[in-house]
Amino acid sequence: MKNIVIIGAGVAGINAATKLVDNDFKGNIHIIDMGKNPYERPYEEVMTGFLGAGGWSDGKLTYSTQIGGQLSKYVGEDKAMELMKQVVDNFSRFHPHPEQIVLSNPEEEPEFIKPYFGLRLFPCWHIGTDYLHEIGKSWYDYLISKGVKFYWENKVSNINFSFNKVTFESVNEKSWGNLFYDRLIFGVGKSGIDFTSEIMKEYNLPTEEKPVQVGVRFEAPQKHFQKLIDVAYDFKLYRKLDNVSLRSFCTNNNAAYVAVEETYGDHSYNGHAKKDESFRNDMTNFGILMEIRGVDKPFKWSRNLVKNVQKNSTGMYYSPSRTPSTTSEGIGVSTTQIDNLDIIRLAFQGYFKYIDNFIDDMKLVFPTLKDDWGIYVPEVKYLAPEPLVDYSDLSLTKYPNVHFVGDALSARGISVSGAHGTLVAEKILEN
Protein backbone atom coordinates (compact mmCIF):
# COMPACT_ATOMS: atom_id res chain seq x y z
CA MET A 1 0.00 0.00 0.00
CA LYS A 2 1.47 3.36 -1.06
CA ASN A 3 2.21 6.13 1.41
CA ILE A 4 1.65 9.68 0.19
CA VAL A 5 3.09 12.39 2.43
CA ILE A 6 2.04 15.98 1.75
CA ILE A 7 4.00 18.76 3.42
CA GLY A 8 1.69 21.75 3.75
CA ALA A 9 -2.11 21.80 4.03
CA GLY A 10 -2.38 24.71 1.61
CA VAL A 11 -4.48 24.90 -1.54
CA ALA A 12 -2.06 22.73 -3.55
CA GLY A 13 -1.82 19.93 -1.00
CA ILE A 14 -5.54 19.87 -0.21
CA ASN A 15 -6.53 19.71 -3.89
CA ALA A 16 -4.03 16.88 -4.37
CA ALA A 17 -5.52 14.91 -1.49
CA THR A 18 -9.05 15.58 -2.76
CA LYS A 19 -8.25 14.31 -6.24
CA LEU A 20 -6.80 11.14 -4.75
CA VAL A 21 -9.69 10.30 -2.42
CA ASP A 22 -12.29 11.24 -5.05
CA ASN A 23 -10.78 8.48 -7.18
CA ASP A 24 -10.67 5.86 -4.40
CA PHE A 25 -6.92 5.93 -3.93
CA LYS A 26 -6.10 2.83 -1.87
CA GLY A 27 -2.97 4.09 -0.11
CA ASN A 28 -2.39 6.23 2.97
CA ILE A 29 -2.41 10.02 2.78
CA HIS A 30 -0.60 12.03 5.47
CA ILE A 31 -0.63 15.85 5.60
CA ILE A 32 1.74 17.81 7.86
CA ASP A 33 1.17 21.51 8.58
CA MET A 34 2.49 24.08 11.06
CA GLY A 35 -0.95 25.61 11.53
CA LYS A 36 -4.32 24.50 12.84
CA ASN A 37 -7.41 22.77 11.48
CA PRO A 38 -10.16 25.08 10.16
CA TYR A 39 -12.21 24.83 13.35
CA GLU A 40 -9.34 26.10 15.51
CA ARG A 41 -7.44 28.35 13.11
CA PRO A 42 -7.60 31.97 14.36
CA TYR A 43 -8.19 34.83 11.93
CA GLU A 44 -4.78 36.36 12.56
CA GLU A 45 -2.92 33.23 11.37
CA VAL A 46 -3.12 34.07 7.69
CA MET A 47 -0.21 31.95 6.42
CA THR A 48 -0.58 28.51 8.01
CA GLY A 49 -3.40 26.06 8.65
CA PHE A 50 -6.02 24.35 6.49
CA LEU A 51 -6.00 25.79 2.92
CA GLY A 52 -2.99 27.94 3.83
CA ALA A 53 -2.81 31.58 2.77
CA GLY A 54 -5.36 30.89 0.02
CA GLY A 55 -7.96 29.88 2.59
CA TRP A 56 -7.53 33.19 4.45
CA SER A 57 -7.38 35.37 1.33
CA ASP A 58 -9.62 37.60 -0.77
CA GLY A 59 -11.50 34.54 -2.03
CA LYS A 60 -11.14 35.13 -5.77
CA LEU A 61 -10.39 32.33 -8.22
CA THR A 62 -8.95 33.60 -11.48
CA TYR A 63 -9.32 31.45 -14.58
CA SER A 64 -6.46 32.34 -16.88
CA THR A 65 -2.95 31.19 -17.76
CA GLN A 66 -1.84 34.82 -18.22
CA ILE A 67 -1.24 35.22 -14.49
CA GLY A 68 -0.27 33.12 -11.50
CA GLY A 69 2.78 31.25 -12.72
CA GLN A 70 3.83 28.95 -15.54
CA LEU A 71 1.18 26.24 -15.53
CA SER A 72 0.62 26.29 -19.30
CA LYS A 73 4.38 25.90 -19.82
CA TYR A 74 4.19 22.59 -17.99
CA VAL A 75 1.02 21.07 -19.44
CA GLY A 76 -0.20 23.23 -22.34
CA GLU A 77 -3.06 25.73 -22.47
CA ASP A 78 -6.02 23.34 -22.65
CA LYS A 79 -4.85 21.08 -19.83
CA ALA A 80 -3.99 24.08 -17.65
CA MET A 81 -7.52 25.45 -18.02
CA GLU A 82 -9.01 22.03 -17.23
CA LEU A 83 -6.93 21.70 -14.05
CA MET A 84 -7.88 25.18 -12.84
CA LYS A 85 -11.56 24.46 -13.46
CA GLN A 86 -11.30 21.41 -11.19
CA VAL A 87 -10.06 23.74 -8.43
CA VAL A 88 -12.98 26.12 -8.99
CA ASP A 89 -15.37 23.16 -8.86
CA ASN A 90 -13.92 22.04 -5.52
CA PHE A 91 -14.49 25.44 -3.94
CA SER A 92 -18.04 25.49 -5.31
CA ARG A 93 -18.67 21.95 -4.10
CA PHE A 94 -17.87 22.75 -0.46
CA HIS A 95 -19.43 26.24 -0.47
CA PRO A 96 -22.44 26.53 1.90
CA HIS A 97 -24.23 28.78 -0.64
CA PRO A 98 -22.78 28.08 -4.10
CA GLU A 99 -25.52 30.12 -5.74
CA GLN A 100 -23.90 33.24 -4.23
CA ILE A 101 -20.61 32.76 -6.09
CA VAL A 102 -20.24 35.66 -8.53
CA LEU A 103 -18.56 35.23 -11.92
CA SER A 104 -16.95 38.26 -13.56
CA ASN A 105 -16.11 37.67 -17.23
CA PRO A 106 -15.06 40.87 -19.05
CA GLU A 107 -14.66 40.57 -22.80
CA GLU A 108 -13.51 43.96 -24.11
CA GLU A 109 -10.91 46.43 -22.89
CA PRO A 110 -12.53 49.86 -22.35
CA GLU A 111 -11.19 52.77 -24.38
CA PHE A 112 -10.59 55.03 -21.38
CA ILE A 113 -7.90 52.63 -20.08
CA LYS A 114 -5.91 52.16 -23.28
CA PRO A 115 -3.82 55.36 -23.38
CA TYR A 116 -2.31 54.62 -19.96
CA PHE A 117 -2.61 50.93 -19.03
CA GLY A 118 -3.17 47.49 -20.42
CA LEU A 119 -6.13 45.61 -18.91
CA ARG A 120 -5.93 41.84 -18.69
CA LEU A 121 -9.31 40.25 -19.29
CA PHE A 122 -10.23 36.84 -17.88
CA PRO A 123 -13.01 35.13 -15.91
CA CYS A 124 -12.88 35.40 -12.12
CA TRP A 125 -15.07 33.69 -9.51
CA HIS A 126 -15.57 35.68 -6.29
CA ILE A 127 -16.05 33.25 -3.41
CA GLY A 128 -15.81 35.74 -0.54
CA THR A 129 -13.35 35.76 2.35
CA ASP A 130 -16.08 35.09 4.90
CA TYR A 131 -17.26 31.94 3.08
CA LEU A 132 -13.75 30.52 2.76
CA HIS A 133 -13.81 29.63 6.45
CA GLU A 134 -17.00 27.58 6.09
CA ILE A 135 -15.70 25.98 2.90
CA GLY A 136 -12.59 24.94 4.80
CA LYS A 137 -14.60 23.22 7.53
CA SER A 138 -16.73 21.22 5.07
CA TRP A 139 -13.73 20.31 2.96
CA TYR A 140 -11.73 19.20 6.00
CA ASP A 141 -14.60 17.05 7.26
CA TYR A 142 -14.80 15.36 3.86
CA LEU A 143 -11.09 14.49 3.81
CA ILE A 144 -11.23 13.19 7.39
CA SER A 145 -14.19 10.99 6.44
CA LYS A 146 -12.07 9.55 3.62
CA GLY A 147 -9.27 8.57 5.98
CA VAL A 148 -6.78 11.37 5.34
CA LYS A 149 -4.55 11.80 8.40
CA PHE A 150 -3.51 15.32 9.44
CA TYR A 151 -0.60 16.30 11.69
CA TRP A 152 -1.46 19.80 12.90
CA GLU A 153 0.96 22.22 14.56
CA ASN A 154 3.90 20.17 13.33
CA LYS A 155 6.91 21.47 11.45
CA VAL A 156 9.07 19.38 9.13
CA SER A 157 12.68 19.59 10.29
CA ASN A 158 14.34 17.25 7.79
CA ILE A 159 13.68 15.34 4.58
CA ASN A 160 15.92 12.46 3.57
CA PHE A 161 15.39 12.00 -0.16
CA SER A 162 17.67 8.95 -0.19
CA PHE A 163 15.62 7.03 2.40
CA ASN A 164 12.22 8.59 1.56
CA LYS A 165 11.86 9.82 5.14
CA VAL A 166 10.27 12.97 6.57
CA THR A 167 11.12 14.02 10.13
CA PHE A 168 8.80 16.47 11.89
CA GLU A 169 8.35 17.93 15.35
CA SER A 170 5.55 19.75 17.11
CA VAL A 171 5.83 23.54 17.01
CA ASN A 172 6.26 23.56 20.78
CA GLU A 173 9.08 20.98 20.36
CA LYS A 174 7.53 18.56 22.84
CA SER A 175 7.21 15.66 20.41
CA TRP A 176 8.55 14.47 17.06
CA GLY A 177 8.02 11.71 14.53
CA ASN A 178 9.01 10.18 11.19
CA LEU A 179 6.98 9.28 8.12
CA PHE A 180 8.19 7.20 5.19
CA TYR A 181 6.79 7.94 1.76
CA ASP A 182 6.46 6.41 -1.67
CA ARG A 183 5.54 9.83 -3.08
CA LEU A 184 6.22 13.18 -1.43
CA ILE A 185 4.23 16.31 -2.35
CA PHE A 186 6.15 19.39 -1.22
CA GLY A 187 3.78 22.34 -0.87
CA VAL A 188 5.07 24.43 2.01
CA GLY A 189 3.86 27.80 0.72
CA LYS A 190 5.14 31.26 1.58
CA SER A 191 5.75 30.42 5.23
CA GLY A 192 8.21 27.68 4.24
CA ILE A 193 10.42 29.60 1.84
CA ASP A 194 13.48 29.40 4.08
CA PHE A 195 13.06 25.65 4.50
CA THR A 196 12.62 25.27 0.73
CA SER A 197 15.88 27.13 0.17
CA GLU A 198 17.66 24.92 2.71
CA ILE A 199 16.44 21.74 1.00
CA MET A 200 17.50 22.95 -2.43
CA LYS A 201 20.94 23.87 -1.11
CA GLU A 202 21.38 20.62 0.84
CA TYR A 203 20.61 18.47 -2.19
CA ASN A 204 22.20 20.80 -4.72
CA LEU A 205 18.99 20.97 -6.74
CA PRO A 206 19.25 22.82 -10.05
CA THR A 207 17.18 26.01 -9.77
CA GLU A 208 16.06 29.10 -11.61
CA GLU A 209 16.11 32.47 -9.82
CA LYS A 210 12.79 34.33 -9.73
CA PRO A 211 12.50 38.12 -9.99
CA VAL A 212 11.64 40.51 -7.16
CA GLN A 213 7.90 41.06 -6.62
CA VAL A 214 7.27 44.01 -4.32
CA GLY A 215 5.07 47.08 -4.09
CA VAL A 216 2.24 48.59 -2.05
CA ARG A 217 -1.40 47.95 -1.14
CA PHE A 218 -3.47 50.82 -2.59
CA GLU A 219 -6.82 51.81 -1.05
CA ALA A 220 -9.49 54.35 -2.03
CA PRO A 221 -13.27 54.79 -1.98
CA GLN A 222 -14.84 52.46 -4.54
CA LYS A 223 -16.76 55.23 -6.32
CA HIS A 224 -13.59 56.43 -8.05
CA PHE A 225 -13.09 53.05 -9.80
CA GLN A 226 -16.71 52.03 -10.37
CA LYS A 227 -16.67 52.42 -14.15
CA LEU A 228 -13.81 49.93 -14.34
CA ILE A 229 -15.29 47.59 -11.72
CA ASP A 230 -18.44 47.42 -13.86
CA VAL A 231 -16.24 45.97 -16.63
CA ALA A 232 -14.01 43.71 -14.51
CA TYR A 233 -14.50 43.06 -10.79
CA ASP A 234 -10.92 41.84 -10.26
CA PHE A 235 -9.34 44.21 -12.75
CA LYS A 236 -5.65 43.82 -13.63
CA LEU A 237 -4.04 47.03 -14.84
CA TYR A 238 -0.52 46.47 -16.13
CA ARG A 239 2.41 48.04 -17.92
CA LYS A 240 5.76 46.64 -19.02
CA LEU A 241 9.06 48.49 -19.18
CA ASP A 242 12.61 47.31 -19.90
CA ASN A 243 13.48 45.62 -16.60
CA VAL A 244 10.37 46.42 -14.57
CA SER A 245 6.74 45.48 -15.10
CA LEU A 246 3.86 46.63 -12.91
CA ARG A 247 0.39 45.27 -12.33
CA SER A 248 -2.53 45.83 -10.06
CA PHE A 249 -3.14 42.64 -8.13
CA CYS A 250 -5.84 41.08 -5.96
CA THR A 251 -8.56 43.73 -6.29
CA ASN A 252 -11.21 43.86 -3.56
CA ASN A 253 -14.45 45.82 -3.76
CA ASN A 254 -17.76 46.47 -1.96
CA ALA A 255 -16.73 45.05 1.42
CA ALA A 256 -12.99 45.45 1.00
CA TYR A 257 -10.52 45.35 3.87
CA VAL A 258 -6.75 45.63 4.10
CA ALA A 259 -5.15 42.69 5.90
CA VAL A 260 -1.80 42.40 7.67
CA GLU A 261 0.48 39.45 6.93
CA GLU A 262 3.45 38.57 9.13
CA THR A 263 6.40 36.78 7.54
CA TYR A 264 9.85 36.44 9.10
CA GLY A 265 8.66 38.74 11.90
CA ASP A 266 7.91 41.64 9.53
CA HIS A 267 4.54 43.05 8.47
CA SER A 268 3.31 43.35 4.91
CA TYR A 269 -0.17 43.92 3.48
CA ASN A 270 -2.78 42.15 1.42
CA GLY A 271 -6.52 42.53 0.93
CA HIS A 272 -9.75 40.65 1.69
CA ALA A 273 -13.30 41.01 0.39
CA LYS A 274 -16.40 39.89 2.27
CA LYS A 275 -19.64 38.74 0.65
CA ASP A 276 -21.98 39.50 3.56
CA GLU A 277 -23.66 42.88 2.97
CA SER A 278 -23.29 43.75 6.65
CA PHE A 279 -19.55 44.24 6.00
CA ARG A 280 -20.01 46.67 3.09
CA ASN A 281 -17.74 49.71 3.39
CA ASP A 282 -17.74 50.82 -0.27
CA MET A 283 -13.95 50.73 -0.44
CA THR A 284 -11.58 49.31 -3.05
CA ASN A 285 -8.08 48.01 -2.41
CA PHE A 286 -5.52 46.30 -4.61
CA GLY A 287 -1.81 45.67 -4.76
CA ILE A 288 0.44 47.65 -7.07
CA LEU A 289 3.23 45.14 -7.59
CA MET A 290 6.47 45.55 -9.47
CA GLU A 291 8.30 42.61 -11.00
CA ILE A 292 11.94 43.68 -11.07
CA ARG A 293 14.36 41.65 -13.16
CA GLY A 294 18.13 41.70 -12.98
CA VAL A 295 18.48 42.21 -9.21
CA ASP A 296 21.34 40.21 -7.69
CA LYS A 297 20.07 37.78 -5.03
CA PRO A 298 16.42 38.87 -5.43
CA PHE A 299 15.09 37.01 -2.38
CA LYS A 300 17.63 38.64 -0.05
CA TRP A 301 17.01 42.02 -1.69
CA SER A 302 13.26 41.71 -1.04
CA ARG A 303 13.81 40.72 2.59
CA ASN A 304 16.04 43.75 3.18
CA LEU A 305 13.54 46.12 1.57
CA VAL A 306 10.72 44.84 3.77
CA LYS A 307 12.86 45.28 6.90
CA ASN A 308 13.65 48.86 5.91
CA VAL A 309 9.98 49.87 5.69
CA GLN A 310 9.05 48.67 9.18
CA LYS A 311 8.38 51.28 11.86
CA ASN A 312 7.13 50.66 15.39
CA SER A 313 7.16 46.91 14.64
CA THR A 314 4.76 47.20 11.70
CA GLY A 315 4.53 48.52 8.14
CA MET A 316 3.82 52.09 7.03
CA TYR A 317 0.86 54.04 5.65
CA TYR A 318 0.93 57.18 3.54
CA SER A 319 -1.95 59.28 2.23
CA PRO A 320 -2.29 62.88 1.06
CA SER A 321 -5.66 63.15 2.82
CA ARG A 322 -6.82 59.95 4.54
CA THR A 323 -6.11 57.92 7.67
CA PRO A 324 -5.71 54.12 7.86
CA SER A 325 -8.88 52.05 7.65
CA THR A 326 -10.24 49.48 10.07
CA THR A 327 -10.40 45.73 9.67
CA SER A 328 -13.68 43.85 9.23
CA GLU A 329 -13.65 43.39 13.01
CA GLY A 330 -13.59 47.18 13.50
CA ILE A 331 -9.97 47.32 14.67
CA GLY A 332 -7.50 49.74 13.14
CA VAL A 333 -5.17 48.17 10.58
CA SER A 334 -1.73 47.73 12.15
CA THR A 335 0.43 50.38 10.50
CA THR A 336 2.43 53.54 11.21
CA GLN A 337 1.22 56.64 9.37
CA ILE A 338 3.95 58.79 7.80
CA ASP A 339 3.63 62.30 6.35
CA ASN A 340 5.96 61.88 3.37
CA LEU A 341 7.42 59.11 1.24
CA ASP A 342 11.13 59.86 1.67
CA ILE A 343 11.90 56.76 3.76
CA ILE A 344 9.89 54.59 1.34
CA ARG A 345 11.67 55.91 -1.73
CA LEU A 346 15.03 55.32 -0.06
CA ALA A 347 14.13 51.72 0.82
CA PHE A 348 12.99 50.99 -2.75
CA GLN A 349 16.40 52.11 -4.09
CA GLY A 350 15.09 54.15 -7.00
CA TYR A 351 12.31 51.79 -8.06
CA PHE A 352 9.48 53.62 -6.26
CA LYS A 353 9.29 56.11 -9.14
CA TYR A 354 7.44 53.45 -11.13
CA ILE A 355 4.74 53.24 -8.45
CA ASP A 356 4.57 57.05 -8.30
CA ASN A 357 3.98 57.12 -12.06
CA PHE A 358 1.38 54.35 -11.84
CA ILE A 359 -0.62 56.31 -9.25
CA ASP A 360 -0.26 59.58 -11.19
CA ASP A 361 -1.67 57.92 -14.30
CA MET A 362 -4.55 56.40 -12.34
CA LYS A 363 -5.48 59.93 -11.31
CA LEU A 364 -5.68 60.83 -15.01
CA VAL A 365 -7.81 57.80 -15.88
CA PHE A 366 -10.03 58.22 -12.80
CA PRO A 367 -10.19 62.04 -12.42
CA THR A 368 -12.30 62.04 -9.23
CA LEU A 369 -9.55 60.14 -7.41
CA LYS A 370 -7.30 63.18 -6.89
CA ASP A 371 -5.76 62.86 -3.39
CA ASP A 372 -8.47 60.57 -2.00
CA TRP A 373 -6.26 57.49 -1.62
CA GLY A 374 -3.70 55.84 0.64
CA ILE A 375 -1.01 53.17 0.40
CA TYR A 376 0.11 50.52 2.88
CA VAL A 377 3.78 49.61 2.52
CA PRO A 378 4.96 47.00 1.70
CA GLU A 379 3.14 44.35 -0.24
CA VAL A 380 5.54 41.57 -1.18
CA LYS A 381 5.47 38.15 -2.81
CA TYR A 382 8.52 36.21 -1.72
CA LEU A 383 9.63 33.85 -4.47
CA ALA A 384 12.41 31.44 -3.66
CA PRO A 385 14.52 30.10 -6.54
CA GLU A 386 12.38 27.65 -8.49
CA PRO A 387 13.62 24.05 -8.72
CA LEU A 388 13.78 22.49 -12.16
CA VAL A 389 11.05 19.85 -12.52
CA ASP A 390 9.75 17.29 -14.96
CA TYR A 391 6.91 19.12 -16.71
CA SER A 392 4.72 16.02 -16.86
CA ASP A 393 4.28 15.60 -13.10
CA LEU A 394 6.25 18.44 -11.41
CA SER A 395 8.75 15.97 -9.94
CA LEU A 396 12.34 16.93 -9.21
CA THR A 397 14.71 16.01 -12.00
CA LYS A 398 17.03 14.31 -9.46
CA TYR A 399 14.31 12.72 -7.29
CA PRO A 400 11.33 11.60 -9.41
CA ASN A 401 9.13 10.63 -6.43
CA VAL A 402 9.28 14.17 -4.97
CA HIS A 403 6.85 16.71 -6.42
CA PHE A 404 7.00 20.48 -5.84
CA VAL A 405 3.67 22.35 -5.95
CA GLY A 406 2.14 25.73 -5.18
CA ASP A 407 4.32 28.58 -3.97
CA ALA A 408 7.24 26.14 -3.66
CA LEU A 409 7.10 26.07 -7.48
CA SER A 410 6.47 29.83 -7.82
CA ALA A 411 2.71 29.59 -8.25
CA ARG A 412 0.81 32.79 -7.50
CA GLY A 413 -2.86 32.51 -6.74
CA ILE A 414 -5.38 29.94 -5.59
CA SER A 415 -6.30 28.48 -8.98
CA VAL A 416 -2.77 27.76 -10.18
CA SER A 417 -1.63 26.39 -6.81
CA GLY A 418 -4.60 24.04 -6.66
CA ALA A 419 -3.98 22.99 -10.25
CA HIS A 420 -0.42 21.97 -9.36
CA GLY A 421 -1.71 19.62 -6.67
CA THR A 422 -4.42 18.23 -8.93
CA LEU A 423 -1.91 17.49 -11.70
CA VAL A 424 0.43 15.60 -9.36
CA ALA A 425 -2.48 13.56 -7.97
CA GLU A 426 -3.58 12.62 -11.48
CA LYS A 427 -0.11 11.30 -12.25
CA ILE A 428 0.00 9.32 -9.00
CA LEU A 429 -3.34 7.73 -9.88
CA GLU A 430 -2.01 6.74 -13.31
CA ASN A 431 0.81 4.79 -11.68
Where are these regions (language model features)?
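Residues forming the flavin
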Residues: 2-65, 105-431
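Dinucleotide-binding Rossmann-like beta1-alpha1 core, especially the glycine-rich loop
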Residues: 49-102
